[in-house]
């Protein structure tokens, strides 16, 4: 089925069993908030992105599942760094999803552009930049697999804002069966 990147993201979060997501809205992620409003996922609004990251970390510690935090571009994304570092040091599974400037503006010092991929590299297990809506589902599934396997820890998924509005074919994940 043909869906926009934001809806693909939210569907993948539901596939992973995500029931709560922590965050603070911003312009680059408004499409995600529109998709979340039509989903089964509960958004927990915090007063600051750092608080959202620590709340997601606390959720992960308590539930044993990866916590999920959502932040906008620029200072919204950089506000996650302390929480990501804490999750990294304590091996807490976390998936941090950040919006960024539109793809064509990356690398041009655009308003609120921060290279959060490189900034977060020392304090994450892995980072992914989603460059097309068709990459969204594989990126989210990989982020959860990496966050929750081996030495657990935070994984960053950075998404240029226009990718949330681009469409791509989405196929739900096939559940794995165990005997």
For the regions a language model picked out, list residue spans one by one.
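N-terminal alpha/beta PP-like core and its mobile active-site loop of ThDP/TPP-dependent enzymes
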Residues: 1-179
């Amino acid at each position: 089925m043909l869906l926009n990147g934001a809806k693909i993201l939210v569907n993948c979060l539901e596939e992973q069993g995500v029931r709560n997501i922590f965050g603070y809205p911003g312009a680059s992620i408004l499409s995600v908030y529109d998709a979340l409003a039509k989903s089964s996922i509960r958004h927990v609004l915090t007063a600051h992105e750092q608080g959202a990251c620590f709340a997601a970390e606390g959720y992960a510690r308590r539930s044993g599942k990866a916590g999920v935090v959502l932040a906008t571009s620029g200072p919204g994304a950089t506000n996650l760094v302390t929480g990501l570092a804490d999750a990294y040091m304590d091996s807490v599974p976390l998936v941090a999803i950040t919006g960024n400037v539109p793809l064509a503006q990356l690398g041009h010092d655009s308003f609120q552009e921060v290279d959060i991929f490189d900034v977060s590299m020392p304090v994450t297990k892995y980072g992914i930049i989603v460059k097309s809506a068709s990459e969204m589902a594989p990126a989210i599934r990989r982020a959860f697999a990496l966050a929750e396997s081996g030495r657990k820890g935070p994984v960053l998924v950075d998404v240029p804002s226009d990718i949330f509005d681009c469409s791509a074919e989405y196929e739900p994940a096939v559940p794995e069966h165990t005997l």
